[in-house]
UniProtKB/Swiss-Prot annotation:
This is Cytokinin hydroxylase. One of its GO terms (biological process) is trans-zeatin biosynthetic process. It catalyses: N(6)-(dimethylallyl)adenosine 5'-phosphate + NADPH + O2 + H(+) = 9-ribosyl-trans-zeatin 5'-phosphate + NADP(+) + H2O; N(6)-(dimethylallyl)adenosine 5'-diphosphate + NADPH + O2 + H(+) = 9-ribosyl-trans-zeatin 5'-diphosphate + NADP(+) + H2O; N(6)-(dimethylallyl)adenosine 5'-triphosphate + NADPH + O2 + H(+) = 9-ribosyl-trans-zeatin 5'-triphosphate + NADP(+) + H2O. GO terms for molecular function: heme binding; iron ion binding; monooxygenase activity; oxidoreductase activity, acting on paired donors, with incorporation or reduction of molecular oxygen. The gene is CYP735A1. It comes from Arabidopsis thaliana. It is found in: Membrane. Induction: By trans-zeatin and isopentenyladenine in roots. Down-regulated by auxin and abscisic acid in roots. InterPro entries: Cyt_P450 (IPR001128), Cyt_P450_E_grp-I (IPR002401), Cyt_P450_sf (IPR036396), Cytochrome_P450_Monooxygen (IPR050665). Expressed in roots and flowers. Disulfide bonds: none annotated. Keywords: Heme, Iron, Membrane, Metal-binding, Monooxygenase, NADP, Oxidoreductase, Transmembrane, Transmembrane helix. It is a single-pass membrane protein.
Amino acid sequence: MLLTILKSLLVIFVTTILRVLYDTISCYWLTPRRIKKIMEQQGVTGPKPRPLTGNILEISAMVSQSASKDCDSIHHDIVGRLLPHYVAWSKQYGKRFIVWNGTDPRLCLTETELIKELLMKHNGVSGRSWLQQQGTKNFIGRGLLMANGQDWHHQRHLAAPAFTGERLKGYARHMVECTSKLVERLRKEVGEGANEVEIGEEMHKLTADIISRTKFGSSFEKGKELFNHLTVLQRRCAQATRHLCFPGSRFLPSKYNREIKSLKKEVERLLIEIIQSRRDCAEMGRSSTHGDDLLGLLLNEMDIDKNNNNNNNNLQLIMDECKTFFFAGHETTALLLTWTTMLLADNPTWQEKVREEVREVFGRNGLPSVDQLSKLTSLSKVINESLRLYPPATLLPRMAFEDLKLGDLTIPKGLSIWIPVLAIHHSEELWGKDANQFNPERFGGRPFASGRHFIPFAAGPRNCIGQQFALMEAKIILATLISKFNFTISKNYRHAPIVVLTIKPKYGVQVILKPLVS
């Protein structure tokens, strides 16, 4: 009897080992080779990969070299700085080529018609890859940004009401209040002689305060520790992703992995405090629901699922959504505001043009009204041009979950497609000879191909759920600041864009503020 049990256990053990071995070989060898063969048959090649590391070492060396020096002046020809591997290999292999992230093949695609087809028509059979999900697992988890399939549909449906209709307009009051407080503080600081301001830091604080108040019923001061931890966690996760292509790397007790684990634990502890505080209000009878902001909608749904014995929307998912929107809701908008302020400070003619428009629409001392934001056409052009030159992300990734057809190209299941947004936004073929110059008028004189040439918020059903929120917020903040201050570039500003998940100014953006007479 005992011998039979031992034999059975041995069979199970050996079968499991063989299965794991086969899956590993399939994942890291058989599937990549199959994809490589299919793409080569279509004439799509790329730089020769090294065993295990693929092209990672080459990319890392090129990026390190190109970004090691600051720009010698303020210019916007930054594709070669941030995506030097794309520049080199697109010249050699054309508009389609394969790059290897370890043993993971990635198709770099810049043909805008094919990109539109992918984003508009194939969203149901494409999404985030396993490697992407692992890379952000400890940062934003499996929230909306990283979800796929039915999970994505459910989460999108759940969050959508917080970003539409009258509820969206209702957030304007908080945006105006938070911005007015910033103006008061800056006026006081400038009045005391501190007229140089690192505007990036101010924009991050401001957008963090706004997203806290509008989506989570909190404030930046309460969430200050959370935002600080999230910022460090973002950097550490970005640094750790370069090792993901090596099997088992995420389990190693490395310095990065230990620090990531500790930061994640602290972030989730702080989130639980915010969540529990909201739940306590409802349980103590202060409110019949958890509220109608994003956190309230998530908690209300969690209660429904609990009553239906459905555990899909558990506490971990709520925390993942909170991390996703804390990050996406303030980081990308803060960077949009930072780069736009830099561009306006460096282009006084456009700064004055926008200022005159704001005064014409709102009056010299009037506060922005959400119903009149559409009249700020010059400001809209400037914001679009800022998003074109400095999009929040340099790349837009998608993985094919089944074989699909893009034009004349067959995309095999398991192939990741990487869309170099920055390169598309700076393409002279698409935007003209002045593609690397600041020219907001390009968004007024002729229509632009949103969804193909211009994709700062992605496109199709999986576009950014908060883009209207972000644009409304940006217009309110910029309209307020430009009506109260004149800003010029400080001599201490060093132009050095870098990529840490998003495009950031390496040393911040220092501007000189001068209060305007009302």
